[in-house]
């Protein structure tokens, strides 16, 4: 699971409560901001395809899932365009379908990834800061 969907196993109303608490805690504890009474967070009317901005990262060595690692017969193109795994800046999961942003986002991302693969463009190496395509 990528970092984008890390909240999806929790009910939406609970997600909103946690996210509001996270923002409030950050402003008070780190920012030392004296907070007035905070109104409840306004949620999206939709629980999928509600994001208007996402940032994807290219990687020449995509992160494999446990299922992919166990499948010894499969060959995977490790050049990926996706999201960071949770808590890792250097591990990128290839995303075939993202539930956070509406189409044509998925089609555009996949077309760009496939074009880069077909035209042998150099995918980024996050550790070495090399490669034509990064994020």
Label each residue range with its predicted role.
Residues 1-135:
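Accessory RNA-recognition modules of RNA-modification enzymes
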């Amino acid at each position: 699971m990528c970092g984008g969907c890390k909240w999806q196993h929790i009910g939406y109303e609970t997600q909103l409560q946690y996210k509001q608490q996270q923002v409030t805690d950050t402003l008070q504890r780190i920012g030392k901001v004296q907070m007035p009474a905070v109104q409840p967070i306004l949620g999206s009317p939709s629980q999928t395809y509600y994001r208007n901005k996402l940032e994807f990262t290219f990687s020449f060595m995509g992160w494999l899932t446990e299922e992919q690692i166990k499948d010894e017969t499969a060959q995977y193109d490790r050049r990926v365009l996706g999201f960071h795994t949770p808590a890792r800046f250097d591990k990128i999961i290839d995303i075939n379908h993202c539930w956070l942003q509406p189409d044509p986002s998925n089609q555009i991302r996949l077309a760009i990834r496939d074009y880069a693969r077909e035209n042998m463009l150099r995918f980024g190496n996050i550790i070495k800061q090399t490669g034509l395509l990064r994020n």
